Amino acid sequence: LQATVDNGDLKFSNIRVTPFDEKNIPVTLESAKVTGLMVNLQQKTIRAGLAKLSGGRVTARRDADGDLHLVTMFAPRKVQDTKELRKEGFSIAVDRAEIVRYGVALIDQTFQPAVSYDLEQINATISKVAIPAKNTNPFDLSLQIKQGGSVKAKGTLDLLRESVDMRFDAANIALTPLDPVLKRDTTLTLASGKAGASGRVIVDGKKTPPAIRYTGAAAIADLEVQTPAKEKLGGLKRLALNNIVVDTSEKKVAVAQIDVSQPYAKLVINKDKTTNFDVFKRTPAKPAAAPPANAAPAEPAAAPMAITVERVRVESGAMDFADLGLVLPFATFIKDLQGSANGLSSSPDSRASLKFEGGVADYGLARAEGSIQPFAPKKFTDIAVAFRNIELVPMSAYTATFAGRKIASGKVSLDSQYKIENSKLLGDNKMVLDKFTLGERVESPTAVNLPLDLAIALLTDSSGKIDLALPVAGDIDNPEFSYGHVVWQAIRTVLTRVVTAPFRALGALFGSGSETLGDIVFDPGSSRLLPTEQEKPLTISLTADGLVMVQTTEVKDEELIPKLKAIAAERTS
């Protein structure tokens, strides 16, 4: 049979494709036309100058059970041998193929409600299309997203080598349609946010699995997560990832720098010691079914991607913190958080350095600097933390819980060194309290029973400062280990030693190095205060204004009685 078509045109309109058992029409096409058509049946060739699809829409849906609707819909009932198809098939060539003003609805019903994005105004061109493939095909793509955002891409497609090389730019893509993803495991709401990325993508489909390499940048902006009460829980102004390299064949992800601008978080410790993040977690409807006893062994997991981030920089961060598990609820605000972390890596033995600084409440300052193994912090951590000019009155919640007293006045500066090696903690805390006084009593079942006013008076120097050194140690793998408890135990030990041996504390505080301040010695039978003893009460009065000293008398009979007899004998002689 010999038949030819020379420079023909074809046109179809109002195409609708739907399964017999569905009312919805998943595929529509307003018009399809082919111009410059040339067909030669004897040579089995089909040529066209232009193939153009205009208008219409396709719905790509993943059902609740995970099946792709279009794949199921177009699955062939009988698969013909591909080798036979090649023998019998035609060679097809199209100079230019176009898609104009098309739309795609992406729906994922494995989430409830479904995740949905509507791609609109899809315009695409591809040149030099040939089947079987013979050469590379330049292509161009642009589209808008109804929910917000746009995508542009340009590159080449090589069907013979099964490869793609393209550059793309995705801008201002709305993240709020992903709210059902967040709601699957939490009660939180993704209130706002948009994302973007740009760069180059190279795909080599001949490798197994296909190798994908991406170089470029990505960003998230105006992200906000809200609680069920519509309160802001966390978010950020902008997160930018610069100089990204993702290579699936080399199993690596490398980022030169991550810039985080105006991050915010709200952390609340509840009365039962859970956090607000625990409260927002959803309880699974039912536990996952156990695998059958005769199930085949699972395939070994693929090697994880190696992740490296050279630098993370934070600016203008803030956090609201509250602890409701205390006798008096406590809250503070951390502001102007800034700093950086360098050398982050998923390698277990890698160490990262960090340096951060932020304001606490109105006039306080907090700093942290050191190094850590980010994916194994219990193996190695060495962090120095410093607090300066922190008002103590808001800390009454903690003193009320542990000491049964509010704080009337005072400020604190604290230097802490945290060192962890193989889960063993060695901590060193140096604390300076300025003008520190306790206020009214508060009922607390965990309060210590110590004369705290005496301890404070004994510890306060002539300039109104209390200087404490609090070394701590422990095994953080111990389930009963609590760093706060260890520090409080160290403070309690200091206070106990002070009130049970006050003059030893005074001797250490004032430089005598002994307990001699506790004794004022008189010659037996004499009321004259010796010059060597006059310094002791003077020292205490000048350096410890808060103390009231009560002097008691102790008489040593073995020394006094002979002396009194001698004095009496002198008077009668």
Model-derived segments and their meaning:
Residues 6-8, 166, 214-216, 255-256, ...:
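Transmembrane beta-strands of outer-membrane beta-barrel proteins
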Residues 44, 90, 156, 246-251, ...:
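Extended terminal
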Residues 139-146, 155, 353-361, 370:
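Short beta-strand segments that buttress and anchor functional surface loops
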Residues 10, 32, 51, 99, ...:
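Buried hydrophobic packing residues in well-ordered domains
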Residues 39-42, 61, 127-132, 156-160, ...:
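Short beta-strand micro-motifs enriched in acidic
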Residues 50, 71, 175, 392, ...:
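Extracytoplasmic/secreted envelope proteins and their assembly/folding machinery
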